[in-house]
UniProtKB/Swiss-Prot annotation:
This is FMRFamide-18. One of its GO terms (biological process) is neuropeptide signaling pathway. It is found in: Secreted. GO terms for cellular component: extracellular region. Belongs to the FARP (FMRFamide related peptide) family.
């Protein structure tokens, strides 16, 4: 599955 905004937020 493509990276979702939620996953991107976790990276920060």
């Amino acid at each position: 599955a493509p990276p979702q905004p939620s996953d991107n937020f976790i990276r920060f």
